[in-house]
């Protein structure tokens, strides 16, 4: 198992203070999520060494990058990072190939873990190598920027809202490439975003920031299901589930997806996928209703036995959020307070969740 990433920061500005005490996974994608001004980019810049925390301790893969108490501060160029900004900032007078080669120059050949052909193939930019940056779309420029960061052979990738400047179509073009990097490269990523759909699709671990403070840090499926956090109170409240494709009905074009560590299964309308494939889906709280008995005379495909774990008032007093356990997988249901009283909901109660819609993320 990869060594964890430790980030302890205390920075004071005239009208803003950042305090973090984080131990993050040394693999996978960790999302730093929160509204504008919550401290996401400040944390990333401190990790990169572009800002120096007044008090700080940063350790990545057992290498200390900053320790204020011991006077340690590793210069940015000595930190093995690949930094991706909102804008790719390519050199306009160089071709795509020359831009990529520029990123490799400071890395000795014997230390290059990623070669040019591998990076261009991973990002799907082989056909762009001889073009100049002004001939690229926004999505293509950003893919080149990501490839350039990879070619520095980083031990850690830092992505600061890399899709924020792109429209929905360009975002949808890049997301599969980020997922591929996640699958095929053993490089941890810290991904800054305020877009919940991106985070739900990409992240394994979620750090929720607000006004410079860490509200929560944990696996995404657990953090999204916490009723004490603002995420559960919004209209997009829901959970992320990573199940396994266990069957496919060609006649009705329905995948059967087995929930993690469970025999429970959901059916999802989707094109055929190989049995055993991991599939990430999102179930919105507003798409889950509750019933005391299984309703077999319904158009709703997914009916799961669940247990009530806890309940909280939603963002208005007419609704409640109910946290449910479906064979070890957390679910959320948003129902009226009246319905909660009619069902006499209480902790430990067994009932049935009816899931009206399941969104395939990846």
From Swiss-Prot:
SMART domains according to UniProt: AAA
Gene Ontology CC: one annotated term: plasma membrane
Major subcellular site: membrane
Catalyzed reactions: molybdate(out) + ATP + H2O = molybdate(in) + ADP + phosphate + H(+)
Annotated keywords: ATP-binding, Cell inner membrane, Cell membrane, Membrane, Molybdenum, Nucleotide-binding, Translocase, Transport
Location within or outside the cell: Cell inner membrane
The EC number(s) this enzyme carries: 7.3.2.5
Top-level division of the source organism's lineage: Bacteria
Gene Ontology molecular function, alphabetical: ABC-type molybdate transporter activity; ATP binding; ATP hydrolysis activity
Top enzyme class: translocase
InterPro entries linked to this entry: AAA+_ATPase (IPR003593), ABC_transporter-like_ATP-bd (IPR003439), ABC_transporter-like_CS (IPR017871), Mo/tungstate-bd_C_term_dom (IPR008995), ModC_ABC_ATP-bd (IPR011868), Molybdenum_import_ModC (IPR050334), Mop_domain (IPR004606), P-loop_NTPase (IPR027417)
Membrane topology (UniProt): Peripheral membrane protein
Domain Mop: 297-362
Binding site for ATP: 34-41
Hydrolase recorded as keyword: no
Every ABC transporter domain range: 2-236
PANTHER family, alphabetized: ABC TRANSPORTER I FAMILY MEMBER 10 (PTHR43514), MOLYBDENUM IMPORT ATP-BINDING PROTEIN MODC 2 (PTHR43514:SF10)
Function noted in UniProt: Part of the ABC transporter complex ModABC involved in molybdenum import. Responsible for energy coupling to the transport system.
Quaternary data: The complex is composed of two ATP-binding proteins (ModC), two transmembrane proteins (ModB) and a solute-binding protein (ModA).
Family: Belongs to the ABC transporter superfamily. Molybdate importer (TC 3.A.1.8) family.
NCBIfam families noted in UniProt: modC_ABC
Protein name listed in UniProt: Molybdenum import ATP-binding protein ModC
Organism (species): Pseudomonas savastanoi pv. phaseolicola (strain 1448A / Race 6) (Pseudomonas syringae pv. phaseolicola (strain 1448A / Race 6))
Name of encoding gene: modC
């Amino acid at each position: 198992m990869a060594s964890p990433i430790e980030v302890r920061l205390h920075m004071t500005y005239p009208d803003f203070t950042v305090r973090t005490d984080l131990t993050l996974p040394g693999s996978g994608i960790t999302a730093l999520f929160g509204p504008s001004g919550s401290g996401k980019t400040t944390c990333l810049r401190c990790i990169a060494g572009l800002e120096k925390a007044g008090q700080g301790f940063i350790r990545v893969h057992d290498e200390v990058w900053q320790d204020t108490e011991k006077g340690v501060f590793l210069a940015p160029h000595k930190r093995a990072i690949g930094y991706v900004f909102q804008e790719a900032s390519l050199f306009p007078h160089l071709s795509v190939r020359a831009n990529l080669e520029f990123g490799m120059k400071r890395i000795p050949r014997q230390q290059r873990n990623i070669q040019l052909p591998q990076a261009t193939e991973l990002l799907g930019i082989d056909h762009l190598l001889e073009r100049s940056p002004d001939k690229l779309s926004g999505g293509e420029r950003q893919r080149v920027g990501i490839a350039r960061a990879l070619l520095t052979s980083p031990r850690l990738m830092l992505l600061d809202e890399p899709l924020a400047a792109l429209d929905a179509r360009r975002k949808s073009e890049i997301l599969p490439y980020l997922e591929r990097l996640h699958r095929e490269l053993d490089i941890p990523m810290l991904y800054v975003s305020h877009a919940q759909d991106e985070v739900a699709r990409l992240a394994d671990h979620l750090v929720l920031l607000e006004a410079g403070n860490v509200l929560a840090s944990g696996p995404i499926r657990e953090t999204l299901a916490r009723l004490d956090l603002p995420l559960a109170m919004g209209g997009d409240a829901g959970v992320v589930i990573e199940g396994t494709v266990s069957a496919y009905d060609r006649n009705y074009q329905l995948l059967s997806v087995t929930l993690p560590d469970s025999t429970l299964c959901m059916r999802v309308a989707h094109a055929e996928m190989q049995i055993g494939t991991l599939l990430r889906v999102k179930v919105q709280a507003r798409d889950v209703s509750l019933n005391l008995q299984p309703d077999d005379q319904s158009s709703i495909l997914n009916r799961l036995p669940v247990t009530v774990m806890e309940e909280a008032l939603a963002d208005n007093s007419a609704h409640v959020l109910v946290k449910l356990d479906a064979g070890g997988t957390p679910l959320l249901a948003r129902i009226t307070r009246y319905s909660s009283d009619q069902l006499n909901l209480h902790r430990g109660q067994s009932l049935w969740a009816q899931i009206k819609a399941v969104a395939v993320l990846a």
